[in-house]
């Protein structure tokens, strides 16, 4: 593994990013009150944009600005599928970091807003590449399906689904207070 000690150019770049004003829109909403909001507040996060490093927030806001101006819902879908992996909530995978094998990004802790004391910053460019690869694989797999999957959220007594045509039903179980839905 290669480790680089930051030189004067690196430090100047960091200072320029941290001191600069991001010229693109990004959300700055205050976090709402809630049962699980003490975790981010304990880490100094009181507003949505504080979940991101300044560098990642800058790049994400530029990417979103470009996508939003094109009004392309597919690109917005891909963007929304990667923003959670760009936050300060990403944790380091200690075993992989020190001993190799897989990536050192363990991702975020699902179902929480926990910010690790040792967060890991991910490259937005790598995230975009990953999402494009993921999406292409998903499209290829869908092309092999003989029948299109059907999702129905209407009343069961007004169903348009023919009898004996359902292979699988997924229901979202109630988790009580374990997961916050709002």
Can you describe what each PLM-predicted range is?
Residues 168-182:
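Metal-dependent catalytic core segments for phosphate chemistry
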């Amino acid at each position: 593994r290669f480790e680089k000690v930051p030189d004067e150019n690196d430090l100047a770049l960091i200072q320029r990013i941290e001191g600069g004003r991001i010229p693109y829109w990004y959300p700055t909403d205050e976090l709402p009150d809630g049962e699980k909001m003490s975790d981010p507040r304990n880490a100094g996060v009181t507003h949505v944009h504080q979940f991101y490093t300044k560098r990642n927030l800058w790049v994400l806001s530029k990417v979103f600005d470009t996508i939003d101006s094109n009004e392309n819902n597919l690109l917005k879908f891909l963007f929304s599928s990667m923003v959670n992996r760009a936050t300060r909530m990403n944790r380091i995978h200690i075993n992989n970091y020190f001993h190799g094998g897989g990536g050192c990004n363990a991702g975020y802790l699902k179902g929480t807003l926990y910010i690790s004391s040792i967060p890991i910053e991910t490259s937005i460019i790598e995230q975009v590449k990953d999402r494009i690869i993921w999406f292409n694989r998903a499209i290829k797999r869908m092309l092999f399906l003989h029948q299109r999957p059907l999702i129905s959220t209407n009343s069961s007594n007004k169903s348009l689904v023919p009898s004996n045509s359902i292979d699988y039903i997924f229901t979202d179980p109630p988790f009580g207070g374990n997961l916050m839905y709002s």
